A protein has these predicted regions:
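Histidine-centered active-site/metal-ligand motif
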Residues: 410-413, 478, 485, 739
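Histidine-centered active-site microenvironments of extracellular/periplasmic hydrolases
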Residues: 188-192, 462-512, 574-575
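Active-site-proximal alpha/beta segments of enzymes that process anionic O-linked groups
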Residues: 4-80, 95, 103-119, 128-174, ...
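Short, flexible loop segments at boundaries between secondary-structure elements
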Residues: 432-441
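Membrane-interface soluble catalytic domains
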Residues: 2-16, 77-78, 82-84, 91, ...
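Substrate-binding rim/cap in mid-to-C-terminal beta-strand-loop elements of soluble/periplasmic
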Residues: 257-283, 431, 489-546
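Beta-strand elements within well-structured catalytic alpha/beta cores of enzymes
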Residues: 102, 165-187, 304, 401-409, ...
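A structural signal for well-ordered alpha-helical segments within the folded catalytic domains
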Residues: 170, 215, 219, 294-302, ...
Length: 739
């Protein structure tokens, strides 16, 4: 029986079919989820936002005219009538079993007009779930978690730089750094990671030799962030690093905004892309089932398409690049066939793709690849540089603007650097029977390789004359825990803090260096608001495009990272009739692709200042998505790992006393009452109240995200049946006989 438990298949439906009966019965009797509702397509009871508890923990009553508790918002969330019936040939409802997904070329993007000038038919709505609206929908003015800083001023250095340097943003490059922990960007002496490496030698005398190797581990990252590595010879931080000519463009105090406290929205790469590229929080379900649901916000490529349509509607061209059309591309050196990424990329609005298939295509402009494949997903990122160079060169030649999403991959397991790379080092002391140390060392080498690659990437932009007119956004998709450094391994169903801290920075040679404090934590959902705000503040959009951007900016769940981190909350608008008074009109509903871009301009909402104790909560989905949720809050040291459809326990930590969650053992409990009691005994009443509120917020957020996405299938892939659970979390094969 033990052997069968080890070798039996894990994918649906075999995971259920091949379980040994005694073990399966024992699991059902003794290992049940703390809240089994999270395993179901719908809750068994109504789940409301804990308004009173939220106000009590914050220590103040909300404004009397705070909009989310109003009857208007309750009607919108719970009694919104369905849209007109669909045509009989329409696609199946979002969240319900669809036919096999079509190839990207057949995908019809319902955010925009079709080629004939009329809108494509709307998808049919699923039956209204018991707890809320009929399908995907988000209204920021009715979101009790919505905090806005758009009424705040820009950071002082930024205001001065905009007047003096007049930065120009013609292009945007968003680089997603695979599995890149914040403590590796840059790597610093004296950190827990450094101490882990040094301790492997058993003697502090090894520090001098070790420092010579480690001080150049993340030269580029140190220069870009403006954070010292704390080594005596900190060449990059002192401006004398061996970087490309591009570094001279960032003279003095220039560089951009470095968000030191960034937290991932998901420890699963493709869900993390949804937060950064679409400004949406992902679905708390296994794998990328967002492709079966309905995106409730336009992603960045779709926003840029809206700007193109606004320019077309205006007709009159403005001088310079402001009226040039935007092109979009997604570039990676690995496959896009894993877990439906090829569908997700297309649904996001990308129309140009570079993947490993491009590199393998004899008809490609830079075939054959110069390097062999270095992992089971594809090639090293350097193979994409010629293709990205072509994108920027062609955009410049054709008077077009460019948005490129680029994802690295070498830092992903199995942590293999190109065989011909000469920079490989030995960092950890060799110990017999210690494969976990070998794996961490391999990861460190991929971090060093990636750092050099970023230098090459910026050198390419500089050589093409695009660096001074390109906003470069760098963000990690998630962190990664290692047994050697964190006493736990991987990000799979693992709520350790090492899996969540990520780099996030906005770079431009004419922007000043702004360091956002670690306490001002943010998630990648703030990337789109920040990019739009920067385009507006630098006068990098035409009048027509600016109107669209201004209308879109307040809609998103994230915040602008170029403004003071003080908050306002939505309030009722007594001065004008609500646009939502018509039961079929909603200014925040993006499900009508035939709406003209100027139809969104009047959708802003009034706000009032929030209490000084009000700070954003952050919800981070843990790989694979439906089992655990990590909950944290800006300016709070507390973290709660909350089980969803999982037999795992609750886990509470206080980062003020245990920044790496190892100095003090986490509190573990198997019931909410036991957790609150344990937190109160160790950390006091305030911490206990926070933990209980975080648990209530997590429960509400779980079902609210399903309502927003219009998704009503089980959270775990093994519970979705043969059709819905097939091939999720796997690479799609080209032939049926491939296994």
């Amino acid at each position: 029986m033990l052997i069968l438990q080890c070798v039996r298949p894990r994918s649906a439906p075999y995971a259920h079919m091949s379980g040994s009966l005694p073990v399966t019965l024992a699991e059902s009797l003794f290992f049940n989820p703390i809240n089994a509702d999270f395993c179901l397509p719908h809750p068994t009871h109504r789940v409301d936002f804990p308004f009173e508890q939220y106000a009590k923990v914050l220590g103040h009553a909300p404004p009397a005219d705070w909009k989310p508790p109003s009857d208007e918002c309750r009607r919108r969330h719970h009694h919104r009538p369905p849209p007109p019936p669909p045509p009989p040939h329409g696609p199946p409802p979002p969240g319900y079993p669809p036919p096999p997904p079509p190839p990207p070329d057949d995908f019809e993007d319902d955010w925009f007009w079709d080629e004939e000038g009329g809108p494509p038919p709307p998808p049919p709505p699923p039956p209204p779930p018991p707890h809320g609206g009929p399908h995907g929908h988000y209204d920021p003015s009715c979101d009790p978690m919505k905090l806005s800083n758009l009424d705040e001023g820009l950071f002082d250095p930024l205001t001065t730089a905009l007047k003096q340097n007049k930065p120009k943003i013609k292009n945007v490059l968003l680089v997603t750094l695979e599995s890149t922990r914040k403590d590796m960007f840059p790597f610093k002496k004296g950190t827990h990671a450094y101490d882990t490496i040094l301790s492997s030698y058993g003697s502090p005398d090894a520090a001098e030799t070790l420092d010579k190797k480690l001080r150049n581990l993340t030269t580029t990252a140190s220069f870009l962030t403006g954070e010292s590595t704390r080594f005596e010879e900190d060449a990059a931080f002192n401006g004398t690093g061996h970087l490309g000519a591009w570094a001279s463009e960032f003279a003095g105090a220039k560089g951009g905004i470095n968000v030191q406290g960034a937290v991932t929205g998901s420890a699963y790469t493709l869900k993390s892309l949804i937060t950064s590229l679409c400004g949406m929080e992902p679905l708390p379900v296994d794998f990328t089932d967002e492709v079966r649901a309905h995106m409730y916000q336009p992603c960045l490529p779709q926003i840029l398409s809206m700007l193109n349509k606004a320019e077309q509607a205006k007709g009159k061209k403005e001088d310079g690049f402001l009226s040039w059309p935007w092109d979009t591309a997604h570039v990676q050196s690995v496959t896009d066939q894993f877990d439906s990424q090829y569908i997700l990329d297309d649904q996001m609005g990308f129309r140009t793709f570079v993947t490993d298939d491009t590199l393998d295509d004899p008809a490609s402009g830079h075939y054959p690849p110069k390097e062999p494949r270095n992992n089971y997903f594809g090639y090293p990122e350097t193979e994409t540089l010629p293709y990205m160079r072509d994108l920027f060169a062609n955009a410049k030649r054709d008077n077009r603007r460019l948005f490129v999403s680029h994802m690295t991959s070498t830092t992903h397991h199995p942590f293999a650097v190109p065989a011909a790379w000469p920079g490989k080092e030995t960092y950890m002391a060799k110990r017999r029977f210690a494969p976990e140390a070998d794996e961490f060392e391999s990861y460190l080498n991929t971090i060093k390789w990636q750092d050099g690659y970023l230098d090459s990437l910026l050198s390419m932009l500089h050589a093409e004359g695009a660096l001074n007119e390109t906003l470069v956004v760098m963000v990690g998709d998630h962190g990664l825990a290692f047994k050697a450094s964190d006493d736990c391994k991987s990000n799979f169903e693992n709520g350790h803090i090492a899996n969540f801290g990520i780099p996030m920075l906005f770079l431009h040679p004419d922007l000043p260096r702004v360091q956002l404090d670690i306490a001002d934590a943010a998630t990648p959902t703030s990337i789109i608001p920040t990019v739009l705000d920067l385009l507006l503040q630098t006068d990098s959009l035409s009048d027509a495009s600016s109107e669209v951007a201004k209308g879109l900016l307040p809609r998103y769940q994230g915040h602008s990272m170029i403004r003071e981190q003080r908050w306002s909350v939505p309030v009722l608008n007594y001065s004008s009739s609500s646009a939502s008074s018509s039961p079929y009109h909603d200014p925040y509903d993006f499900h009508h692709p035939h709406d003209a871009p100027n139809a969104i301009i009047d959708a802003s909402f009034p706000t009032t200042n929030a209490s000084a104790n009000t700070h954003p909560f952050h919800f981070s989905i843990i790989n694979p998505g439906g089992s655990l949720l990590a909950i944290s809050q800006s300016h709070s040291p507390y973290r709660l790992v909350f089980p969803l459809c999982s037999t795992l326990p609750l886990r509470f930590t206080d980062l003020s006393s245990s920044p790496n969650e190892q100095t003090v053992a986490p509190l573990i409990a198997w019931s909410v009452d036991a957790m609150v009691k344990a937190v109160r005994a160790r950390h006091g009443d305030d911490a206990a109240a926070w933990a209980d509120l975080a648990r209530r917020l997590g429960e509400w957020w779980f079902w609210e995200q399903r309502r927003r996405w219009g998704y009503h299938l089980p959270a775990r892939s093994t519970d979705r049946g043969v059709v819905d659970g097939y091939a999720v979390g796997q690479i799609r094969k080209k032939h049926w006989w491939e296994t």
